Amino acid sequence: MTQKLHIALLFGGNSSEHDVSKRSAHNIYDALDKEKYDVSLFMFTKDGILLGNEDSQKIFDGEPEDQVVAEAYQKMDMSSPLAPIMALNEQKEIDFFFPVIHGNLGEDGTIQGLFKLLNKPYVGSNIAASAMSFDKDLTKKIISQAGIRNTPYVVVTPENQADYSWGRIEEKLGNLTFVKPAKQGSSVGIHRVTNAEEYEKALDDAFKYDYKILVEQGIANPQEIEISILGNEHPIASKLGAVRVPKDDPFYDYENKFVDASGVVFELPVKLPQYLVDEITDMALKAYKALGMKGMARIDFLVDSNNVPYLGEPNTLPGFTNISLYPQMWEVSGISYSDLIDRLIQLGLQEFERNSKIKYDFRKLGTERVGQKKYNED
């Protein structure tokens, strides 16, 4: 009998997507084939503290989170903020990590750094790709260098804010712009801006979430198109999906995504001219490779009235809730939810195996390096 792979499913986190992460984790847990996998649960609280399997399971099973967390804190070694994390290292039976932590901590390279320290395989992109893809400014710099179309923008910080009055923004970008924190997910802190008063209010709010703010040129009445990517060195793309928001809503915001999605319509697969489908697919795959992403990503596009696509944002750990488009786009492309989860695990194992062959100490290379003398220590 083949030994089961022991999966650690990590969820929660200290971002605004804490509850979304819990819903994603439930779906992934249900989709994991228990004939193949043993599963342990580890939840990061809203304070960013990691709970063990027993307490995480209680919350997973529906016990009041605040009560379970309070009781867990009382019995937990809080002498060092690293204590709960180091306790994870003692779980020697864990073979593989499946993070479902959206936003900061989960998508900014932090949790990936922990997995690297623990020397364990995991689902998704590595530290660098996660960090670059989570920072909207870095993403735009990289995809622009790769020749991928995206909207013009400027970066506003507390230090240069005086240089970017609304008059200057309007001159550079026009009178329809979007103000966005550079490192936030799920449309948190994003504002549609058309005048000086809105601009000042938007900056004040966005600075609550980050000290680097993007002000992007807006596109009037765009189509919001999404595509799912799966793979490592040779990624594949799903069929495209569209998000149709109510006409009274300016864009697909946090409210639409997580509070009241009743007016949102998903078109799967979306009907677009084939040349446009091909262009978006090519842009998405090119961006995936340029950013060094692995495992999976959902990539968002805006398409203007002339059917010109602009790459919006990549998401290295997309949602897996009942309304999340990432798994739905694969469903309509012929890959079931459970098969998708299996593939993601296999991709993580393959990437770990590939990276394990890299030598980090040149003294151990000896004569393997062509044209270099064998290293001899004195």
Curated annotation (Swiss-Prot):
Family matches, as NCBIfam families: D_ala_D_alaTIGR (TIGR01205), PRK01966.1-4 (NF002528)
UniProt source species: Limosilactobacillus reuteri (strain DSM 20016) (Lactobacillus reuteri)
GO BP annotations, alphabetical order: cell wall organization; peptidoglycan biosynthetic process; regulation of cell shape
Keyword ATP-binding among UniProt keywords: yes
Record Gene3D superfamilies: 3.40.50.20, ATP-grasp fold, A domain, ATP-grasp fold, B domain
Any one annotated GO CC term: cytosol
Positions contributing to ATP binding: 170-225
Domain ATP-grasp: 140-346
Protein name per UniProt: D-alanine--D-alanine ligase
Binding site for Mg(2+) 1: D300, E313
Compartment(s) where it occurs, according to its Swiss-Prot or TrEMBL record: Cytoplasm
Gene Ontology MF term list: ATP binding; D-alanine-D-alanine ligase activity; metal ion binding
Role summary: Cell wall formation.
Pathway: Cell wall biogenesis; peptidoglycan biosynthesis
